[in-house]
């Protein structure tokens, strides 16, 4: 954890970066991207992952094929809504170790969910014995938990392009 003086320096650096790079919405050019088509993670067990994401969280499985780059490996996708896909690979025979938080790694994936589904998801997680945190940090709309391979998932009810109650594109 940074010292008090380091925290002051870090906040000053963030303020400098905001002043230099963060343009007011009216001055921002349109993004050259249309959105995230898909993100792909690595899992240890295809069926376990399907049961977690489809049966527990309610994200429909929309494709399951062999990974064209690694014979025997599966490549499969879940529909996250808004035409966004979450994909997975398994790599049987490689003996991959569980991931750790590291530079370049994924700290968590935040998935926008309807506010009225929060209690239903909590009930499903409780029934399945999945531990979760939230609401926390004063953000009632946010819940964190880990999938069977330790990938941290955040479900939040902020609409897309909102962060901590603030609309980012206006």
Segments and roles (model prediction):
Residues 23-25, 63-64, 72, 93-98:
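A short, acidic/glycine-rich surface segment
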Residues 42-85:
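Core segments of cupin and vicinal oxygen chelate
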Residues 85-88, 154-155:
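Short glycine-/small-residue motifs
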Residues 1-29, 35-44, 76-81, 97-170:
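Vicinal oxygen chelate
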């Amino acid at each position: 954890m940074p010292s008090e003086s380091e925290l002051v320096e870090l906040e000053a650096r963030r303020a400098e970066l905001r002043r230099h790079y963060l343009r007011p919405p009216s001055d921002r050019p349109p993004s050259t991207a249309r959105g995230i088509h898909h993100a792909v993670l690595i899992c240890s067990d295809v069926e376990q992952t399907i049961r977690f994401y489809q049966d527990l969280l309610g994200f429909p499985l929309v494709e399951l094929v062999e990974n064209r780059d690694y014979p025997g490996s599966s490549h499969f996708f879940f529909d996250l809504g808004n035409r966004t896909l979450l994909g997975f690979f398994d790599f049987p025979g490689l003996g991959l170790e569980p991931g750790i938080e590291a530079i370049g790694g994924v700290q968590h994936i935040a998935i926008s969910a309807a506010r009225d589904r929060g209690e239903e998801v909590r009930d499903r997680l409780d029934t399945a014995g999945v531990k979760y945190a939230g609401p926390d940090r004063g953000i009632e709309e946010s819940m964190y938990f880990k999938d069977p391979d330790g990938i941290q998932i955040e479900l939040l009810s902020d609409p897309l392009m909102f962060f901590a109650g603030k609309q980012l594109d206006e």
